[in-house]
C-alpha cells in the first residue's frame, strides 16, 4: 500500500475544509438522471495511493445545505464508450469512409471504424455535458459555477495513450468562468494537468499550498509556462523509460531503451482490434514504409526532435 505524505491534502479535502460540499460522480449523477444502485455509487477513483473516501460527500450536489457552494469531479465515459456512442440515437455519427487518419496509421477497415467510433464519443460527451449544463441552468447555478472540461489522455492507439507524442499527451481543456474569463479567449502556451488544481483553488479563493508544483492559470500570480515535461515508465507489465520536453513549437524525446520496439508486448493493448489489424497488415507487407518504421520497427531512435509547426504528426 502506498501512503501519501500526511502534510499533503487532496483537492476535495481543501475544498471541504473551506465549506464546500464535495462530489465525485458520473455524467448521470451530474445531469440528475442517475437511478437505482447507480444513484449512490461514486465516480471513478482508481488513485494509486491510500485515501479517505470521506473527502467526498456524495456523487452529486442535491443534498448540500441551502446556499452551500459545491465542488464536483464528474467522470465522463469519454473515448472508452465507443459502442455506446456508435449505437446512441442522441448524436450524429461519423462514417468510417470519411475518417482522416494520421499518416502513420493504415486505412485498414478496422482502424477506420474504430477511429469513427472514437470521434462519435466526442459527440456523446458533448451531449452529456449539455445535460449537465441544462441542470445547472435549471437550478440557476450556471452563471455562478466555474467549469473545467479536461480529459486524462489521448486516444488509446499505437502512438497515443501511454506515449509522449502529442496524440497521447495533448488534450482538450476548456474553461467556463463567468465574469472571470472572457468567453472565446484562446491561449496557446503549454499547460499541465496539475495546473487545474491550483487554478481551481484560485477561483474558489482558497490558499494554494506552497508544496504544490501546480501554477494557477489566471489571476495576478499567473505565470505562463515555457515548456511542458512528460514521461513514460512502466505501463501495466511493460517497462520503458521515455522523457519528453515540449515547447509551443518543438518536442524533444529521449528513449531510455532504444533497443526495444515501439509496440512492446502489453496485455492491455495487444488484443485490441486495431493493434491486431496493424500487425496483420505489417506481416502481409501492406503498411507504407513510414507506418512500418514508426509502428513496427524492432528498435527506436535514442533521441527524437520534432518541429511541430512543419511536422505536426511527429
Model feature map: region roles:
Residues 1-304, 312-313:
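Formylglycine-dependent sulfatase
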